[in-house]
Amino acid sequence: SHKGKVIAIENQNSWTDGGVAAPTPFYWSTNGYGMMWYTFKKGEYDFGATEKNVVKLSHNSSYLDIFYMVNDGAVALLNDFYQLTGNPVLLPKFGFYEGHLNAYNRDYWKEDEKGILFEDGKRYKESQKDNGGIKESLNGEKNNYQFSARAVIDRYKSHDMPLGWLLPNDGYGAGYGQTETLDGNIANSKSLGDYARQNGVEIGLWTQSDLHPKEGVSALLQRDIVKEVRDAGVRVLKTDVAWVGAGYSFGLNGVADVGRIMPYYGNDARPFIISLDGWAGTQRYAGIWSGDQTGGVWEYIRFHIPTYIGSGLSGQPNICSDMDGIFGGKNETVNIRDFQWKTFSPMQLNMDGWGANEKYPHALGEPATSINRMFLKLKSELMPYTYSFAKEAVDGMPLIRAMFLDYPSAYTHGTATQYQYMYGTDFLVAPVYQKTQADEKGNDIRDGIYLPAGSWIDYFSGEKYEGNCILNNFDTPIWKLPVFVKNGSIIPMTNPHNNVSEIDTVS
C-alpha cells in the first residue's frame, strides 16, 4: 500500500530504500480502477500524504493525457495496462539460473598476499591500470587462463554450482577483445560463446555505449549488436546508466531496438534484456534490475522484498538485483540469507569485480558454499514450477505476488505482510531479513509470518500448520528459509542440475 506516501515518478538513479530506479506512470486500486499517464515527463503521486484520503497526481506537462481503466481485480487491471504498453516478456529458460557478470578484458592481476586466492595457490590483486601484473582476457589464450572468462565457467563447474549465463564485459572501458578490429573482437567473443555453450551456458554483453557501429570509436569500445547476436551468439544484454541513464523514451527505445534484433538475427531467440531506468512499456522487452547497492547488511535484503512485490504490482514482474550486492559483502549470514530467498525469484545476478570482495556463491567458504549450492540446486529443481508461473505472468498474476492478491483482507491490504509473498499459487515465502535472536553461527528465528486460512506444510520439515494465524519464534537455522506449501498442492519439479542442458526430460 502507498497510503500516506508521496511517490516520485521520475528517473532518479537512486538505488537505496525510497529511491526510484525504474518508474512507471501507472497505478491501480483494489476499488476497481487504474490510471496511466500518457507522458514521458516527470511526475509525483501523492496518496494522502499532504491531505488525508485525497490522492493528488501530477506530471510536469502542459497538457492532460490520461488513460482510465475500470475493471474488476488485479489481473484485469494489469491487462488493461498491458493492452496499452505491451505484455511482459517471458524470459528464456536459462535466464532463471544465476548469471555471473564481470569484466575480463581490461584489468591486470599482480601477486599480493592480501589479494584473492586463485587456482595456482597464489593471491592476486586486481587493477584497471597496468601494474606490471598479468592482463586478463576472455579466452585465456595469453598464459592467463585463471584470470579469463572461460575460467569462470570452469570454476562454477568445479564447485558444482548452477550457472545459466555469463557477461564478460561488465565494466567501463572493458570491451570484449584485444584485436585492432571490431570483427576480430567479435570473433573473440564468439570463441568464448562456443566454449560457454559447450558447457550449457549462454553469453551476453553489458552496454555502456551505442550498440551500432560509429565512426571515430576505437575497436575496443566499438559495438555492432547485429553481428554480436548473429555471429557471436550473444543472447543476453544488460544496460546501464551510461547508455539508458537518461531513461524515459530514450531508455525505452534502446531496449525496444534490441528486443527486435535478438529474435530476428538470433534464430528466433527469446530476448533476454536486463535494464534499469525503465518506464511504462519496459516490461514488453526487458526485465528490471534495481541498481548498484552494498551487500553484507540486513538492509539490503529488507528493502528488496517489498521492491520485488511492488514491481509486479506495477506491471513489471521480471525483477532482479545483485546477489549480496555489487559492493560490500563478506557477512556470511546475510550472504546465505540473500541466496536463500532469491531462490524464489526470477533472476539472480552475481555481480563480480566492482567491489573489493569476490562475488561467487562459494567465495565465503563453508558453510556458505554448501548452503548456497543447496538453494541454487533447489531453484533448478523448481524450474518447471517457476517457468509455468512466469508464463502466467505474461497476462496474469505476477510470479512474486503480494499476499492480498490471493488472500485479500484488511490485514493483507496494509503493510503487515510486506516482508513475505506468494511465489506462484502454492509457495508462501517469508525471507529472513533481520537479526532477531541470532547466535554466532546465524541460527535465528522469524517472527510475524502470516499464514492465511487453510493448511500449510513447512517445505523443509514437513510439519503441518493450520492457517489464519501469525507465526512467531519460527525456527530458522542458518540453512533454512521459511517456506510453506499450500496443503494439497502438486509441485512440478525436475532433477537438480546446473544449467538448462542438464534438465532430465525423460524421467
Spans of model-derived segments:
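Catalytic and substrate-binding clefts that recognize carbohydrates or anionic sugar/phosphate headgroups
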Residues: S1-N143, I153-D154, D406, N473-N499, ...
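Aromatic-lined carbohydrate-binding/catalytic grooves of carbohydrate-active enzymes
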Residues: V89-V255, M262, Q283-R284
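Flexible loop/turn segments at secondary-structure boundaries
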Residues: M35, K42-Y45, G73-A74, A103-Y108, ...
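Beta-sheet entry/capping signal
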Residues: P25-F26, G32-M35, D65, K93-Y97, ...
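Catalytic core of carbohydrate-active enzymes
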Residues: R260, T282-I288, T307, S311-S321, ...
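Secondary-structure transition/capping motifs at alpha-helix termini
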Residues: K157-G164, A187-G204, K227-L237, G259-P271, ...
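Glycine-rich, histidine-containing beta strand-loop boundary motifs that form or position
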Residues: T30, W37-T39, W165-D170, L205-S209, ...
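Gly/Pro-rich turn-and-neighbor structural signature
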Residues: D130-S158, P162, D183-A187, Y195-G200, ...
